[in-house]
């Protein structure tokens, strides 16, 4: 498409990851060349909040910040553990400090993978951390950028019970029938480039295009396993969705960008007038 027409929005990526420390300028240049108009950058733990805010200032109007506490904490794989309310207590004052600059609260959610949430106590604490962040998002009138690995139904139920309305479920791994409960509630689902090699292809078939957004989850969930993903690969998601839905890539880009604008109202201000 080049620079003509509507740009793409990467609704969920991790640009503060160390994987991008050495060449972020180049990565963002390639994203712009691939017609990406906005990058929604999410946090996982309070230790990266300042870095994300600095990136959003450095690439103002292109990198849009979300702050939140992920259900899995710990920077390196061997340190990873289920979130606690203490993790949230450290994060909340920083989120409050930046509340006016945020696009959304995220990445938040539930992760019931057995290695992180093997006990009912851990699951319950994850729920409490999520409930408090849903309440925070409602108070600040911000959308939620949500993780739900191995916890599709519990996550959608909790969001519903708490009255969350603007919700993005990223890289949803639950059953399509569970996803449809989210569609009924008005939630959006973002599809990463790994869709071309994942078991979630039925999900794309069943979700209406009006409920789909695009994401990369960079540096994870790329088209090839073990290869660093980056925002320019978002076109792979768009092409795959177009193929499954039997529509043009242009239509997928147009509809998913409109969906992103509905979901993240602050994006409107960034559009060229």
Swiss-Prot record:
Cofactor(s), by name: Mn(2+); Ca(2+); Mg(2+); Zn(2+)
- Keyword Zinc: yes or no? yes
| Notes on activation and inhibition | The 3'-exonuclease activity is sensitive to the metal ion present in the active site, whereas the AP endodeoxyribonuclease activity is observed in a variety of divalent metal cofactors. 3'-exoxonuclease activity is suppressed in the presence of Ca(2+), Zn(2+) and Ni(2+).
**Keywords per UniProt:** Hydrolase, Metal-binding, Nuclease, Nucleus, Zinc
Q: Name one Pfam family in it.
A: TatD_DNase
Annotated residues for binding of Zn(2+) 1: 12, 14, 107, 217
- Coiled-coil-forming residues are none
UniProt EC number = 3.1.21.-
- A single Gene Ontology CC term: nucleus
Q: What class of enzyme is it?
A: hydrolase
How, per the record, is the cofactor bound?
Answer: Binds 2 Zn(2+) per subunit. Exhibits AP endonuclease and 3'-exonuclease activities in the presence of Mg(2+) and Mn(2+). In contrast, in the presence of Ca(2+), shows AP endonuclease activity exclusively.
| Sequence positions that bind Zn(2+) 2 | 107, 147, 170
Entry's family note = Belongs to the metallo-dependent hydrolases superfamily. TatD-type hydrolase family.
The free-text function statement in the UniProt record for this protein reads:
Exhibits 3'-exonuclease activities and apurinic/apyrimidinic (AP) endonuclease (in vitro). Show preferential AP endonuclease activity on double-stranded DNA substrates and 3'- exonuclease activity on single-stranded DNA.
Q: PANTHER family, per this entry?
A: DEOXYRIBONUCLEASE TATDN3-RELATED (PTHR46317:SF7), HYDROLASE OF PHP SUPERFAMILY-RELATED PROTEIN (PTHR46317)
User: What name does the UniProt record give this protein?
Assistant: Putative deoxyribonuclease TATDN3
Q: What is the lineage of its organism?
A: Eukaryota, Metazoa, Chordata, Craniata, Vertebrata
């Amino acid at each position: 498409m080049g620079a003509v027409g509507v740009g793409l929005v990467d609704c969920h990526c991790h640009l503060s990851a160390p994987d991008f420390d050495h060449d972020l300028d180049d990565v963002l240049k390639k994203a712009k060349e691939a017609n990406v108009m906005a990058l929604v950058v999410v946090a996982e733990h309070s230790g990266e909040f300042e870095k994300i805010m600095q990136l959003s200032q450095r690439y103002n109007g292109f990198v849009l910040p979300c702050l939140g506490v992920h259900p899995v904490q710990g920077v390196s794989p061997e340190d990873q553990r289920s979130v606690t309310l203490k993790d949230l207590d450290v994060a909340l004052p920083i989120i409050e400090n930046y509340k006016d600059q945020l696009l959304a609260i995220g990445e938040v959610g539930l992760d019931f993978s057995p290695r992180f949430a093997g006990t009912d106590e851990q699951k319950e604490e994850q729920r409490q951390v999520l409930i408090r962040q849903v309440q925070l998002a409602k108070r600040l009138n911000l959308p939620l950028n949500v993780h739900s690995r191995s916890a599709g139904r519990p996550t959608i139920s909790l969001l519903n019970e708490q009255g969350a309305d603007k919700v993005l479920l990223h890289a949803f791994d639950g059953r399509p029938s569970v996803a449809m409960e989210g569609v009924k509630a008005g939630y959006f689902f973002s599809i990463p480039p790994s869709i071309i090699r994942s078991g979630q292809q039925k999900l794309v078939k069943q979700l209406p295009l009006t409920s789909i957004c695009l994401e990369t989850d960079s540096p994870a969930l790329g088209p090839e396993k073990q290869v660093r993903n980056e925002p320019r690969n978002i076109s792979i998601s768009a092409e795959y969705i177009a193929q499954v839905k039997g529509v043009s890539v242009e239509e997928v880009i147009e509809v998913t960008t409109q969906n992103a604008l509905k979901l993240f109202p602050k994006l409107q201000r960034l559009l060229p007038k």
